[in-house]
From Swiss-Prot:
Location of region: Disordered: 35-57
Family label: Belongs to the bacterial ribosomal protein bS21 family.
Signal peptide positions on this chain: none
Biased composition (Basic residues): 43-57
Organism in which the protein naturally occurs: Alkaliphilus metalliredigens (strain QYMF)
PROSITE patterns per the UniProt record, alphabetical: RIBOSOMAL_S21
A biological-process GO annotation: translation
Name used for this protein in its record: Small ribosomal subunit protein bS21
Pfam families per UniProt: Ribosomal_S21 (PF01165)
Single GO cellular component term: ribosome
NCBIfam families reported for this sequence: S21p (TIGR00030)
Length: 57
């Protein structure tokens, strides 16, 4: 879990901006999107193979 300490005289907007940046850097939202719906192992393999094919060309 990302956590920030609000500094003295820091606005809520700045604190929220720092929190969002920290979440993006740690990959929290990407992980949430990835785990939002269950993905069968066979589907994962197909996506991985397709990504490898796209990367190769």
């Amino acid at each position: 879990m990302s956590e920030i300490k609000i500094k003295d005289n820091e606005s809520l907007d700045n604190a929220l901006r720092r929190f969002k940046k920290q979440c993006a850097k740690s990959g929290v939202m990407a992980e949430v999107r990835k785990r939002e719906h269950y993905e069968k192992p066979s589907v994962k393999r197909k996506k991985k193979a397709e990504a490898a094919r796209k990367k190769k060309f």
